[in-house]
Structure formats: structure tokens, C-alpha cells
UniProtKB/Swiss-Prot annotation:
The gene is ASA1. SMART domains: WD40 (SM00320). This is ASTRA-associated protein 1. Component of the ASTRA complex involved in chromatin remodeling. GO terms for biological process: chromatin organization. Its main location: nucleus. It is found in: Nucleus.
Amino acid sequence: MLSKKFTLRSHKSSITYIYPHPTIPSNVFTADSSGLIINWDLTIRRPKSSWQAHTDTILTISTIENNNSNNNGDGDGDGDGDYYLLTHSRDNTIKIWDLLKFSCLLEIPCNSLNFTNIEIFNDLLFTPSSINSNNLDVYKINPKNWQIKRLIFDFDIYKLVNKNENENGNIIQEIGSDTITNNRNDFGIIMQMKIIKTITTTTTNTTTTTTKENQEENGGDFIIYLGFESGDIVGLQLILPPARILSTTNKSTNTNTNTNDKTIIYNQSAKFILKYHNSFHVPNPIICLSNLNSILISSSITNKLIIHYNPIIEIKNLKYSGIQSIVYFKKFHQLIFGYWNGYIQYDDILIKQNLPKLGTTNNNNINNNIDTDINQEQSKLTKKLTFMTILNESKQEISQTSTTTTTTSGGDKSKYSSLIKSKRNFKLPLLLVGYEDGSIVAYNI
């Protein structure tokens, strides 16, 4: 069941993203439509910090890791890894932040004419094309020096699907429509992106193995799924050809030491291959893509939910149309749905947050039927749900508590007791739900 635990109130604009801290399970980042980000400590239910990251709606929050940096950028001072926050906004920028200083390390111009998110996998960044919202750009970010290189520019997904459709011997997983175009000559703008990890294998005469080199050569063991305005969903695999390295080394005749060492690295062009295509949602635009234990889930403006067991799909009819958010509760292998109308559905449980109601009167002289109609209409007014995420249980919570316990001085017994009490009251997993009024409600699951 879902039980309301607490509410966070500091945002004055609609919540647009909630992102768990990469190393501290009790901390989350929340963003709103004004571009403000707040870092919360859920054990005390107070903001730790906040900053104006952008000038418009924040559409995506993620992290990028730098394993070779000497500066810990995760902002908690515990030396547990160099994580940096990545944010994406409708102000046409992507920014990477040092969480110790809240300073911007890198700013990337981007296309935010539509409402799609962006995706990042290791050091690979996927965004709508800078010149065409129907197409895709891919960048490679070097976190050592924050240099960025564009690997793929303005990739036309529609042309790739058409090409594979017309080539003999290639099978496209297209389900739910007789034609891929549906009387259109494109798929429209990209509405949603979702990266889902897969298993990349190589086959020998006797064994099948997975290696780091194989994964790097193929750009990583993942597929990026794109949901379009047309209702089409396309899955792509990125192929990164192996680097060709030319080394020249000159040694001194007297010292046997290197005096000149050059290494030249160059790649062939990266490319995409088509792995999946589904058009069941056509002509309704895709509004949500989610990950069900490495299986894609999709929804549009209708009440249809599609589970993509490639190449088979399962269709579920949900209670309401317009699914704003889908989260997967791993512990019980359950899906939780958040609808446009403000309802949350978990199994057979339905929850809503009502808007404040006007006072009513019990004066018997007023027509009772009119009062009843007014009350019924007011009861339909619910807060508009805008985002959901789950904070799952983690071993890091235990290590964090232990570290804090051992470093607390004996003279701060009252603070220590309060901290331990707050941690006992903070129980994972939690469902965090953001609303249009800027509030964030936490539910125990």
C-alpha cells in the first residue's frame, strides 16, 4: 500500500524533475519550471542548498562521472567518487555542475524547441538535433578536461527505418500498423528518449562471452529508444568502430629513455543500426517511456500501456488516459502510474491530492441539491501530477550512517541523537511525487 509520509515545500513553480543523489540515498535534487534546483536532505526534510541553474523549465537531470579527477565533485566531501550534475533546460542549454562550488564547468547549446528529455550513457550524450527536432545528435564528453566532440550530426531516424523496410533480408519489428508512415513522410518531433541496457556478446566456436572491449566497440551494451510525435517507437544501437592507434617513439642512444612519443588516435564514423520499430500507438504521440527490468514500456495520450517483449508486445488497458509518469518498484516487481489528472495508481490502490476547497455552509435554507453539486465538483479538483520517482533501498545508506556516527564528537550529543532519530524515521523505499503547485509528496511503499 501507499501511505503519505511527508511533504516538501520550497518550490514556487511546477516540479519538472526529481533525481536521487548518486551516492547519498537520503538526498535528492528537485527542479522546477523556473530553472531552480534544490538539494534536499530527506532525513531532516530541509533544503541543503539551492541555485538558479537555468532561466527556463528544467527537462532533465542526470550525472556524469569522472573516475580520474583529483577533485571530488559530488558535493558531499566523502571522497566516494567524482560525480557531476548534468542539467538540461528549455533555455536551450545543457550544463554540467561542480557540486562543491555550484559552478558551471561546461555549457552546451542544444535544441529545446520540443519537450523531450535528453539521455546520457557513460560519456555519450544523446540530444535532439540542433537543426531538426525530428533527428538526433550524439556527443562524446571527456570529463578529464570537459571537452566535447560531436560523433553524429542530424541523424534521420525515419530514413533509416525506411531503408531497412525496403532492403531484402532485413526484418524490422513493426507491430500495430500496416505502414510505417501512416500517411506521413516523417515521424514528427522526438517526444521521449530512453536508454535501456542490454547484454552484448561475442560468439566463438565453443563459447559466448562478453568483454569490455566488445562493449566499447559497440558504444556500450544498450539500446536507445525514441518515441515520436507520430506514435512510432524506434530502438537504435550505436556502433563505435575501434580506434586505430599509430605510435611513434624515439629513444636516446645514450640513456635508453624516450625523448619523443607521439600517439595518433582516429576513428571511422560512428553509426546507428536499427534494432526495433513499433507503431502501435500511431497516431497518438508518445508521452512516456520507462524501463521495466530492462524491458521497454510505453504510453501515449490514451489509456493503453504497451510492454515491449521484443518482438512480442503486451497491451494493458489502464483506468485513466494520459499517463504522466511510470516507475518500476523492483522489490515487488510492480508498476506505479501517475496520471495527468493527478491520480496515482499502485496495483488496485488509487490516490489523489485534492486542491484546497472553498468553505461550505450547512445553512438548511440553501438548496441542498446545489450544495451537493458544488461539493461534487470541488471533489474532482485534484493537484496536477508532474513527475514521479522511487528512492530504493541501498547499502550506501548503511555506510553513510556508520560514517556519520563515527565522526560525531561527544560534545554534540543532542545533535547526534536528533540525527539518529531522523535516520530511523527515514525509511526506504519512498515514492516521491511532484505537483504543479511546487509541492513534493513522499509516500512509503
